[in-house]
């Protein structure tokens, strides 16, 4: 145990070397384990922009992916052999039911997630959750140390694994280690609430390069490195994919940068042009009664996404007659998320109550004004909805980036449609020709939606053309290359301070 009864985040050193020159470490593997009726195990590929961007590099550099397979195991101390799936080497890390409850649902998603999203919901602080977070991070670090070749490169992903860089540095000081945070990094005064604030910052400082979506997150991290660890840091501003900050820790220099993540925009653009997608988009409009305007929301069912905000705005616009109920519909596609967490159960009940109230007030029999689906939607069906809709509503209270906004833009080769976008998304810094709104200002959201609905064709095409230029030029491949190029320039120094 560490000081004050805390579980120590210090791992034991290891001298075991693997054969993978490049290792990605993430909470989940890019495959899901399935048990077939005959009892055998099968692996199903999970779609995702990250694996799409990194797959060529993983193949070229004898790469491996370390992560959880998505199934609960009883014996977590068993070291599974690597799996080869579609020529990719995958190294599973086992999690028990208690691990999932305490490390994932607990510390990751009931402590860190709300804290990093501006405390929209109050974070819960439990020492038992922290201890389990330390333990699981150690297991990920150990699996990575076994997989990585001598002098290899490791890229650790996201908030669930913030202790892995320091642990891995202690085990394998020969490695080049990068870390990227896919969610917002909070303001200093909010982060300081965390009882284990110093341990998290120290964990991240085990990396050679720490990446965030936006310069603001990088600046917050530099301040916290000075305040909590006593490190010397650069004082200038951090730029996007340039002008890196630096943290000096012993004889090590850690670079800190901003790398806005993106999507496989070229592939989406091509798919959205497909004849079958276009036909399906017309069918969707017909199934909705051929309304004059379709508003669309696509989100995980999460309290950060502001689904309630757009429903309130739509209700007020209907009440004030600024939107006509006989020619405008709102479609909300809400993917189930973290259904065992109480705050998410409450959110679902609240959203469904709102939908029922709006339809009860404004719908006609057989013609609801809000169409709500609480289930996953197949990828091509989602693309057809993007093509069919007139206004995309993206109204999070806080979001690290929001890739749905970029996906919508990538699908609109016709230059149709409009994007209403929260100022509190990372995407707002890049999609400046969206209708930007403050989700905390309901009247402002109402005005933004009304303006988007009533834009002229010329203005809409001009806005969409500008946003598409940005999204198509800055795709997920460019994001990955920019991070990894910066990481290659951040080779670790050989020193006795490597694990400081």
Swiss-Prot record:
Catalytic activity: ADP-alpha-D-glucose + D-glucose 6-phosphate = alpha,alpha-trehalose 6-phosphate + ADP + H(+); CDP-alpha-D-glucose + D-glucose 6-phosphate = alpha,alpha-trehalose 6-phosphate + CDP + H(+); GDP-alpha-D-glucose + D-glucose 6-phosphate = alpha,alpha-trehalose 6-phosphate + GDP + H(+); TDP-alpha-D-glucose + D-glucose 6-phosphate = 5-methyl-UDP + alpha,alpha-trehalose 6-phosphate + H(+)
Domain of life of the organism encoding this protein: Bacteria
E.C. number(s) listed in UniProt: 2.4.1.15, 2.4.1.347
A molecular-function term among this protein's GO annotations: trehalose-phosphatase activity
Pfam family, one: Glyco_transf_20
Record's function text: Probably involved in the osmoprotection via the biosynthesis of trehalose and in the production of glycogen and alpha-glucan via the TreS-Pep2 branch involved in the biosynthesis of maltose-1-phosphate (M1P). Catalyzes the transfer of glucose from UDP-glucose (UDP-Glc) to D-glucose 6-phosphate (Glc-6-P) to form trehalose-6-phosphate. Probably also able to use ADP-Glc, CDP-Glc, GDP-Glc and TDP-Glc as glucosyl donors.
Protein name: Trehalose-6-phosphate synthase
